[in-house]
């Protein structure tokens, strides 16, 4: 697993920010870990965190879109593991495109913590499991909060 170029992850001071975490229930063990780590990071940064669950990754964009209207940032979490059909590609492309479009259309940061892996082992390695090198739930939260703070500063500078 490549970690080259990954910036050091530090919690920003997100006191006063409202962030929502939306987590898919498919691949529950992995998604629950992503969820717990994202929520823990958000609260440790001082953000007000609200939590929501959806069935699968395809349901994430519509809920994220609604929450983007009322929150400073939203974190989307899920896990899509490649199977034997092209369905994997359709789901991954659709979710990624949807989350990106929502962020751009609403100017609300969306932390994309949807794992798209070839194997369950790869997903576990990225989910913050004990001994894993990556923690995509916490990383998605930090990215969303950090971006919300940058946007807040830009908006304040505009007056």
UniProtKB/Swiss-Prot annotation:
EC code(s) of this entry: 2.5.1.78
UniProt keyword annotation of Membrane present: no
GO cellular component, one term: cytosol
Chain residues that bind (2S)-2-hydroxy-3-oxobutyl phosphate: 84-85, 126
Active site: 87 (proton donor)
Disulphide bridges, residue numbers: none
Pfam families linked: DMRL_synthase
Catalytic activity, reaction form: (2S)-2-hydroxy-3-oxobutyl phosphate + 5-amino-6-(D-ribitylamino)uracil = 6,7-dimethyl-8-(1-D-ribityl)lumazine + phosphate + 2 H2O + H(+)
Keywords: Riboflavin biosynthesis, Transferase
Annotated residues for binding of 5-amino-6-(D-ribitylamino)uracil: 26, 57-59, 79-81, 112
Record's keyword annotation contains Transferase: yes
BP-aspect Gene Ontology terms: riboflavin biosynthetic process
Enzyme class name: transferase
Associated pathway: Cofactor biosynthesis; riboflavin biosynthesis; riboflavin from 2-hydroxy-3-oxobutyl phosphate and 5-amino-6-(D-ribitylamino)uracil: step 1/2
Record-level Gene Ontology MF annotations: 6,7-dimethyl-8-ribityllumazine synthase activity
Family: Belongs to the DMRL synthase family.
Function (record text): Catalyzes the formation of 6,7-dimethyl-8-ribityllumazine by condensation of 5-amino-6-(D-ribitylamino)uracil with 3,4-dihydroxy-2-butanone 4-phosphate. This is the penultimate step in the biosynthesis of riboflavin.
Full protein name: 6,7-dimethyl-8-ribityllumazine synthase
Organism, as annotated: Corynebacterium efficiens (strain DSM 44549 / YS-314 / AJ 12310 / JCM 11189 / NBRC 100395)
